[in-house]
Amino acid sequence: VALSRRDLIKASATFALVSPRAAGLRLAMGPILGTSGDYDPVALVDPMVGTGAHGHTTPAACLPYGMVQLGPDTDTGRWDACSGYHHDDATIMGFSHNHLSGTGASDLMDVLVVPRTGPLVLDPGTRERPEGSYRQAFDHADERAEPGYYAVRLKDSGIAVELTATARTGMHRYRFPAAGHLLIDLTHGARPAPDPISLRDDPARDTDVTEAMLQIAGPDLIVGSRHVHEWADGRQIHFAMRVSCALDQVRFFNADVEAPAGTRGIAGALLKLAIMLPDAATAPVLVKVALSGVDVAGAIANLDAEAPDWDFDQVRRAARGTWTAQLGRVRVFGGTAEQQGTMASALYHTAIAPNLFIDSDGRYRGMDSAVHSTTQAVGNFSAYSLWDTYRAFHPLLTLVDPERCGQFVRNLVTMAHESPFGLPIWPLQGIETHCMIGWHVVVVIAEALVKGVKGIDVAALWPIVRSLAFDDDGHGLEPYRRLGYIPADTVRESASKTLEYGIDDWAMAVIADAAGAHDDAAKLRARSHNWRTLYDPQTGFVRPRLSDGTFAEPFDPRALGHDSRHWRDFTECNAWQATFLAQHDVPGMIAVMGGDAAFEARLDALFAADSTLLPDAPPDISGMIGQYAQGNEPSHHVAYLYAWCGVPWKTQARVRAIMDTLYNATPAGLPGNDDCGQMSAWYVLSALGIYPVDPVSGIWIFGTPLFPRAEVMVGGGRLVIEAPGVGPDAIYVQRVHWNGRVWNRSWIAHAELARGGHLVFEMGSHPNRDFGRAPESRPPRFESIALP
């Protein structure tokens, strides 16, 4: 069935519905439960989820999408410590003020504060050799983390540490057992692995700081800046710090050489400052720090605006209240305590990034390194992991937080205008990192247009998008347009680029139509099928092609490339997973693979294959079920593809197995990098029973709900999702009801859910093989996407 989106909405709202009474069913349609204020989502969250294994999350104290993430750093020199913290570590270096959440690359960790007793030590040491360094041992039994708060007792000094945060500031409270000191280390930060393929660690490499400044600016005020060249090469960060004790005894260091006594300010590259605290044991020592990407004056203004007082407990209470409101957008009832904790922690991790990157006065540093000004309502943000988050994180926001979704999308459009590189790829604090392939920001923008997000100036955006689509010859785009594929002997990651450029073409066609460029839109829609040039019917896999048109040899579907000299033909996946990457053209995949039965068999083979990977596979291909890899994003939509060939009950079985075996509420509870909330967003949506295989299409595919009841605050009201009878064995959907009537399709339009309503999944322990089997009940084939 080929439908435009307009046809889809009409059909979705008016197709023949069967009433429950006519079907002989009785459903509980009573009053909504759990609205009496007794639901406390903050108490269910464990920020430690994902801090172990390859999750790369941080237990730092922060607010939703805040600029500051104040938390402990245990290591900066290995891949699994990209966030600065790993649950396996036994020592803490100190507490820095911003951290990436779940990423596979490392940066930030600005303004490290080290509280200690005893002699002043300047050496950070290493996790393997902490002796003689300023690191201190700790036990997880002495840690506590909750949204907006972190606490730990340091074993070596006995200092009790508490941390909390506002949007732009972090607040510390230290209880010293004896005289001590605070060390501020501006040399501290990420030391990312130099080899992006092997992810080999380089713990001997220092953070690259080229310019820094530290200054005593008042009786209780310290200010500073640094210019850092790591993943975000050239970013600038400034801070203002107030301390609750006198700054009478301070010591400055440049490259660990002490400045003369009486020094009140210093400039250089490798700066540290020690505040000596002879009376530290007499009262708690309070520290509050604000950050700015603009200048020191901006940091001071942020500090005065958000943390004018010294009431640590009030800041902590306010943070908890903010998180209660944020997490209350999705409430779930029933299930096990483990499932409740996993769900709440996943929802929490979808609200860490992107991060605020605008001062309280409206100034921000843009993608052109210039200082701009706007309103707080417009805002500016950082840390968009778009290759990951276009899949589930941004679609989740279109449902549960459409205002925030619109703010992010409009910000991304502004970045496209400000950046010398055009469309953002992976922007971090005003710097384009150029990380990952494709320009999946266009998927985020197109989805927003399809779902009716307002305020997107498409006419101004389209020339930027068009230039990329038709004029840019870099990144393999010239052969992609000329040959229909990118040759593996000339361009790295050629197979994945060919596949993913097709997804982007599909999205750019929507933007073109919105701009009135319909001829360009038609060309882009046709070009979005280029992925088919890589499908090899002899092997049943997509394969890299060479310039002469032949498939690259040798071929092993487990490999990321065709030879050891140029082994990365695929991006964070192999041919097993990449064969199903055309999420925008599922009917096309079914056609080239030989029809419904053959497509179903290929999916079955993916999940049944031996999970062994080749020795050179990177660690971020993880969370394996067969050759399906939940631990990396290219697989995230694949379990839902069964709906297109009429067997959604297999989606239900696969999705429940993934949720049950690869997610839990422990530090190792994520199957891979959380990637700024994408890994967690997959769980949130899957637990609700829906997923957006093609975000641009504007439809949700049904899966298998995890909880008997969920309440979602949507833009149009409240969406209640019920699953009577759901349980460990009752994972199969028998029937679906929407607003009291039987719903015969295995999908539903976003426009339906966004208005709010009552979605009921009748569950059972055996598959209903008739549900979603009929061709007219399957997800539609889109010839084009019409705009609302």
Stretch-by-stretch model annotation:
Residues 1-16:
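N-terminal secretory signal peptides and thylakoid transit peptides that target proteins
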Residues 22-29:
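Signal peptide processing junction and immediate N-terminal pro/mature segment
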Residues 504:
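ATP-dependent phospho-/nucleotidyl transfer catalytic cores
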Residues 732:
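Extracellular attachment/recognition segments
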